[in-house]
């Protein structure tokens, strides 16, 4: 009986499937990426970044060295320079991975004192403790104001307290720093010394002569006089300017003509100074301007300490990109598992092929009733199932 074309087709499919499984098993066990046929000569250690072992399926064992330009070279692991290079790379990788490549540095809080603002103040005002009140500062203010009045007619240069305060203000704005609370007393003294006015009797009697003398001296000066200010003790909301700018700098005008005009027009100053007596002291409540938080005038007037805002500065850099070599270890269990799966798949294919062939043969088999009919002692027997040729067999 000759096999049908369908049987040949099934056999051919089984053969191709078997041919596919066998190379797959071979490639699964032999994963050699780098074939080391030629070993390299000595390479400087400074040019190497990592190394790795070649696969066992490559046959010849070698060390694959990678340079800084990401080029790979094969080296003999038995040579001494190769072993030294491996030790150096292992030590370097261990040093990098010891702390994870992350470091944190703490910078101590540095709050520089304001030296320019206190240039025109007495040493006793600078050494005041934090709990100094306005009554303690009043004595210093009177002496400072008397010295300022005495030197105003002879000196062409403005007092150092005003120039120092303006310079320190610009520097503090540029640096973005916040002064400590113990320097509040120096700020208040510098601010109050710029707003001290003469007594009402002197102001009313010699206002015209003083204005003329001031007008003759003002064009030669380069900075505004401490007498020219738009701050008023009765209105603390005008004293507090925008954040980061002191009140005695915000309201000033650099032109002496406009400052003299503001003296004559503004009635608030005349009313306030006429109500004062010659022995009265000035007690304005001016809050020092901070770059982060502005305390209320009530807290400054009562002598309470402003809240400290000190945040540690952490300089944390990103972790370094570590390229730690991970050498692949061949897993024998995985290889055995792959072989078992491949064998089971092949046996399953053979079983399916046998069932298909048996079913085909059973379909092509001839039943007994088709053996033929007897005619005159002869029986017609077909040559094969499904054929139209018969053979006469004597009975």
From Swiss-Prot:
CDD domains: Chemokine_CX3C. Residues 148-180, 201-305 are annotated as: Disordered. Disulfide bonds join 32-58, 36-74. Disruption phenotype: No visible phenotype. Mice develop normally and have normal migration of leukocytes to lymphoid tissue and peripheral sites in several models of inflammation. GO terms for molecular function: chemoattractant activity; chemokine activity; CX3C chemokine receptor binding; CXCR1 chemokine receptor binding; integrin binding. A soluble short 80 kDa form may be released by proteolytic cleavage from the long membrane-anchored form. Induction: By 12-O-tetradecanoylphorbol-13-acetate (TPA) and lipopolysaccharides (LPS) in bone marrow stroma cells. Residues 25-100 are annotated as: Chemokine and involved in interaction with ITGAV:ITGB3 and ITGA4:ITGB1. Keywords: Cell adhesion, Cell membrane, Chemotaxis, Cytokine, Disulfide bond, Inflammatory response, Membrane, Secreted, Signal, Transmembrane, Transmembrane helix. Highest levels in brain. Lower levels in kidney, heart and lung. Also found in skeletal muscle and testis. Highly expressed in lesional smooth muscle cells, but not macrophages. Low levels of ABCD-3 mRNA were also found in anti-CD40-stimulated splenic B-cells, but not in resting B-cells. Also expressed in dendritic cells. Gene3D superfamilies: 2.40.50.40. The chain crosses the membrane at residues 337-357. Residues 148-172, 201-210 have a biased composition (Polar residues). Residues 358-395 are cytoplasmic. Residues 101-336 are annotated as: Mucin-like stalk. GO terms for cellular component: cell body; cell surface; extracellular space; neuron projection; neuronal cell body; plasma membrane. It is a single-pass type I membrane protein. Belongs to the intercrine delta family. PANTHER family: FRACTALKINE (PTHR12015:SF92), SMALL INDUCIBLE CYTOKINE A (PTHR12015). Monomer. Forms a ternary complex with CX3CR1 and ITGAV:ITGB3 or ITGA4:ITGB1. This is Fractalkine. The gene is Cx3cl1.
